[in-house]
Amino acid sequence: MEKEFVFGHQNPDTDAIGTAIAFSYLQNKLGYNTEAVALGEPNDETAYALKKFGFEAPRVIKKAAPEVNAVMLVDHNEPQQSVSDIDKVKVTHVVDHHRIMNFNTADPLYYRAEPMGCTSTIVWKMFNENGIEIPEKLAGLMLSAIISDTLLLKSPTTTDDDKKAVEALAKIANVDYKEYGLAMLKAGTNISDKSEEELIDLDAKSFALNGHNVRVAQINVVDLPEALERKDAFLKAMEASSNDNGYDMFMLLITNILDSDSEALVVGSDETKELFEKAFDKKLNDSEVKLPGVVSRKKQVVPPLTEAFEG
């Protein structure tokens, strides 16, 4: 059977990489010939999880078409978040937990989208539905993905299925998920050794909102005031990135994983800043605003932005 690539979105997080590995394993068990690849290097948190459970990072690809004719997508569907030549390959499978936007195919496909906290939760359900056993180390990686996306089950995106998956996978992986989860999340919060340019690109996604190209980046920290000491440098990097890439607005969400509070930094035109303020019903103060309890880009940031920009 002809090989297909399985991959998550650009600037991959633990869900994008971990779930690509898990879904590739599942599909191979079901008779497909797949390879899990990535659209970027793993971040510190993901590297911690990969090392903990004995996985090599998937190789990074820039294009898919030179090697394969077909691909399977996990943790995304929007083409601007996918491989650069996504229009040159056939998408045969999508497993995702985000909104569906700007996604079209010429042929029928397998598409599974559920409002779960993490794509790995959906893949866990698929393992169970197909009666396929999850190996211990893979269970640990899938567990890591769910912990990452749900901030140790504290995010408002968390569902009962996410909680069930965490309990089940932790048992298979033989780990205390609370102890391991906090250690893994903390591994991803060291920002001192990275430049502002690196940080605003680590976990960033682009969204097309009513003709506007909106970039939303997020970084997790354990010390919010310390991170905000770099505010001016962050804003400068965001302005430069916007100019280079044609973003109409760039939002950086800085989230304290310990108390689930965030601050947002925003650059853009007067128009897009007004739309941002409309979305969150808050006024920006020197390009900054407090967003208590906002931790999820998917559930708490993109929906109000979409409503404001398209309203």
UniProtKB/Swiss-Prot annotation:
Molecular function terms from GO: inorganic diphosphate phosphatase activity; manganese ion binding
Main location: cytoplasm
Catalyzed chemical reaction(s): diphosphate + H2O = 2 phosphate + H(+)
Record key words, sorted: Cytoplasm, Hydrolase, Manganese, Metal-binding
Name of this protein: Probable manganese-dependent inorganic pyrophosphatase
Domain of life: Bacteria
Top EC class for this record: hydrolase
Residues annotated as binding Mn(2+) 2: D15, D75, H97, D149
EC assignment: 3.6.1.1
Residues the record lists as binding Mn(2+) 1: H9, D13, D75
The family this protein is said to belong to: Belongs to the PPase class C family.
Species per Swiss-Prot/TrEMBL record: Lactobacillus helveticus (strain DPC 4571)
Pfam families documented for this protein: DHH (PF01368), DHHA2 (PF02833)
Alphabetized Gene3D superfamilies for the sequence: DHHA2 domain, inorganic pyrophosphatase (n-terminal core)
GO cellular component: cytoplasm
Record-annotated membrane-spanning stretches: none
Cofactor note: Binds 2 manganese ions per subunit.
Co-factor(s): Mn(2+)
Entry's localization field: Cytoplasm
